[in-house]
Amino acid sequence: MANMVVTGEQLDKSIREVVRILEDAVGCTAGPKGLTVAISKPYGAPEVTKDGYKVMKSIKPEDPLALAIANIIAQSASQCNDKVGDGTTTCSILTAKVIEEVSKVKAAGADIICVREGVLKAKEAVLEALKCMKREVLSEEEIAQVATISANGDKNIGTKIAQCVKEVGKDGVITVEESKGFKELDVEKTDGMQFDRGYLSPYFVTNSEKMLVEFENPYILLTEKKLNIIQPLLPILENIARSGRPLLIIAEDVEGEALSTLVLNKLRGGLHVAAVKAPGFGDRRKDMLGDIAILTGAKHVINDELAIKMEDLTLCDLGTAKNIRITKDTTTIIGSVDNSCAHVQSRICQIRMQIDNSTSDYDKEKLQERLAKLSGGVAVLKVGGSSEVEVKERKDRVEDALHATRAAVEEGVVPGGGAALLYTLSALDNLKSKNDDEQLGINIVKRALQAPIKRIIKNAGSENAPCVIAHLLKQNDKELIFNVDVMNFANAFTSGVIDPLKVVRIAFDFAVSLAAVFMTLNAIVVDIPSKDDNSAAGGAGMGGMGGMGGF
């Protein structure tokens, strides 16, 4: 496929137009009084959402140049979303403002390299100022406030998320699922460990109506080995049968003679038994089996390295639990060893050290999951509603609120509603520049810092943003904010208008870094659509770019 190179004023104009259109679509969702956006689907009804990231990634211009620019911006938004799961809307508003201001000084003939240095210098000063403004999140009420703000003012969502954090702890797992019921939001708590492995045979089911395996006071046998033959298991199975208690086997796999014999004994009523595959793979499986052993009190995880063999196991070597619930997809161990016992706490400390020492985001995520299973259990937020559109829109807000809450617990909070960024202006007043063009870059960031609060106030139906900003800066009180819910000034922390520092920090960082990339972007190479393609863009000179008709 042939391609072409787009440079100069044509490229700059295209960047400005794409950024403006993206900001219009995404920016309208900002704040508690932000609007929704409908996203059409190839099949089914359009999806209605206030999730800025979802809106951003759904925009695919027909024009190849516009698409290339939009993809660069969407990639940065994706990285922002991956880091904190929120802040995409703020990132979009800031990016658009910086690029708009840069285009003005570029047209005036400023040295763009010096301007870029000024922008990046201002960025570092703002990030430091934000850190000095933070306050730790300690109470359940503060957690609820953060979640409520991120859920666009939905207090029910904020309260439920705070309830989840209280129940499973700051390291606990909280997940979001769609519910088939009409109840808007409900919390389901799992006390214990849950992993994504179900029963190996439906013949193990004890509750045929719900297709569940349900055991009370079972023994738990753990092994890293694959079980093919029944002979090594016979001694411990005989002891289990005499005890009258059920048995759960967690192994790499159970198949062949071993599986068929277990199923046969279960069907004949001689043994209450079930088998599941061990969670994870490779070394991670070994670690997770070790976690289960600690949590259930099992003395051994049978493997080739141990001196003790399967045939030598006694009932005292096995783990135990109050209850076990197994579906075709998950296994939940409930009421095992007390999470506060010394062995469990020692394991938790060990995993925390591994998280601190890990350099891989993927490894950290998996270690965090292990930590959560050991320390806090699992809480599930079940989102319901009267229609699929309603459920999906609410689920988006719940997920955003959950991400924001985690960020707030991790790094603390700052005044919300765009006020935190506004108050960092003072950090730029005394910032020294090498020359006039570098000062232009600093001034660009100053104007960009006012963009989020202006947009939030605009979305609330007011054009009074300049007066609001002037009043906030005049008071010299960095806890003062403008609450658009009541259209009046208030204290950020007493009114609950707060944002997670991590979300604000990363959104600003990514926005300015992305804008800096566009500052020095001199050319884009794009493919020319084939003649059979109905694309709006032609091959010669990108005709039709004016007004971005390709959107």
Curated annotation (Swiss-Prot):
<keyword id="KW-0963">Cytoplasm</keyword>
<protein>
    <recommendedName>
        <fullName>Chaperonin GroEL</fullName>
        <ecNumber>5.6.1.7</ecNumber>
    </recommendedName>
</protein>
<keyword id="KW-0547">Nucleotide-binding</keyword>
<comment type="function">
    <text>Together with its co-chaperonin GroES, plays an essential role in assisting protein folding. The GroEL-GroES system forms a nano-cage that allows encapsulation of the non-native substrate proteins and provides a physical environment optimized to promote and accelerate protein folding.</text>
</comment>
<dbReference type="InterPro" id="IPR001844">
    <property type="entry name" value="Cpn60/GroEL"/>
</dbReference>
<keyword id="KW-0413">Isomerase</keyword>
<comment type="similarity">
    <text>Belongs to the chaperonin (HSP60) family.</text>
</comment>
<dbReference type="InterPro" id="IPR002423">
    <property type="entry name" value="Cpn60/GroEL/TCP-1"/>
</dbReference>
<dbReference type="GO" id="GO:0005524">
    <property type="term" value="F:ATP binding"/>
</dbReference>
<dbReference type="GO" id="GO:0042026">
    <property type="term" value="P:protein refolding"/>
</dbReference>
<feature type="binding site">
    <location>
        <position position="499"/>
    </location>
    <ligand>
        <name>ATP</name>
    </ligand>
</feature>
<dbReference type="InterPro" id="IPR027413">
    <property type="entry name" value="GROEL-like_equatorial_sf"/>
</dbReference>
<feature type="binding site">
    <location>
        <begin position="29"/>
        <end position="32"/>
    </location>
    <ligand>
        <name>ATP</name>
    </ligand>
</feature>
<dbReference type="GO" id="GO:0140662">
    <property type="term" value="F:ATP-dependent protein folding chaperone"/>
</dbReference>
<feature type="binding site">
    <location>
        <position position="417"/>
    </location>
    <ligand>
        <name>ATP</name>
    </ligand>
</feature>
<keyword id="KW-0143">Chaperone</keyword>
<feature type="binding site">
    <location>
        <position position="50"/>
    </location>
    <ligand>
        <name>ATP</name>
    </ligand>
</feature>
<feature type="binding site">
    <location>
        <begin position="86"/>
        <end position="90"/>
    </location>
    <ligand>
        <name>ATP</name>
    </ligand>
</feature>
<comment type="subunit">
    <text>Forms a cylinder of 14 subunits composed of two heptameric rings stacked back-to-back. Interacts with the co-chaperonin GroES.</text>
</comment>
<dbReference type="InterPro" id="IPR027409">
    <property type="entry name" value="GroEL-like_apical_dom_sf"/>
</dbReference>
<dbReference type="GO" id="GO:0016853">
    <property type="term" value="F:isomerase activity"/>
</dbReference>
<dbReference type="Pfam" id="PF00118">
    <property type="entry name" value="Cpn60_TCP1"/>
</dbReference>
<dbReference type="GO" id="GO:0005737">
    <property type="term" value="C:cytoplasm"/>
</dbReference>
<keyword id="KW-0067">ATP-binding</keyword>
<dbReference type="InterPro" id="IPR018370">
    <property type="entry name" value="Chaperonin_Cpn60_CS"/>
</dbReference>
<dbReference type="InterPro" id="IPR027410">
    <property type="entry name" value="TCP-1-like_intermed_sf"/>
</dbReference>
<dbReference type="GO" id="GO:0051082">
    <property type="term" value="F:unfolded protein binding"/>
</dbReference>
